[in-house]
Amino acid sequence: MRLQFFLVMAVATLATISATRVPDDANLQSVNAPVQTVTRSRRFLRTADTDIVYEPKVHNPGKKQVFIEDKLQKALTDPKKNKKLYARWYNSGFTVKQVEGGLDQNENRELELTYKNLALGYAKYYQARRSQEAK
């Protein structure tokens, strides 16, 4: 007989011997009865806050909803955020043409003016940084 078959038989024998147990060693946990006779003490209902009245949301047609365009326009017109964005673009090595090309790919007409102003701002920032590095 080959050594591989002998090893497989030895492992199988050890596995069957060690798998048998004495049922007295089992630790059984006690479980609650499936039929709940006294459920009143175990109920978790929201009966304590019946005095609080939650008003439903009312649709106000006069109030304009805030969409992502509004949030973007607000963020992109903030000078502090723009300088951070310009610095990140400059440190990443983007040229003015790359930034203009990337910002021109939008299909949103509401943000077109904001994107153009952002590209012009980056062009000014780019020229200023280039002139500082040239000195």
Curated annotation (Swiss-Prot):
Coiled coil: none
Motif extent (RxLR-dEER): 43-71
InterPro entries membership: RXLR
Protein origin, superkingdom: Eukaryota
Main location: secreted
KW ATP-binding (keyword) present: no
UniProt subcellular location: Secreted; Host cell
Annotated function: Effector that suppresses plant defense responses during the early stages of pathogen infection. Suppresses cell death induced by effectors and PAMPs in plant hosts.
Entry domain remark: The RxLR-dEER motif acts to carry the protein into the host cell cytoplasm through binding to cell surface phosphatidylinositol-3-phosphate.
Identification of the protein by name: RxLR effector protein Avh5
Naturally occurring in which organism (per UniProt): Phytophthora sojae (strain P6497) (Soybean stem and root rot agent)
Lineage of the organism: Eukaryota, Sar, Stramenopiles, Oomycota, Peronosporales
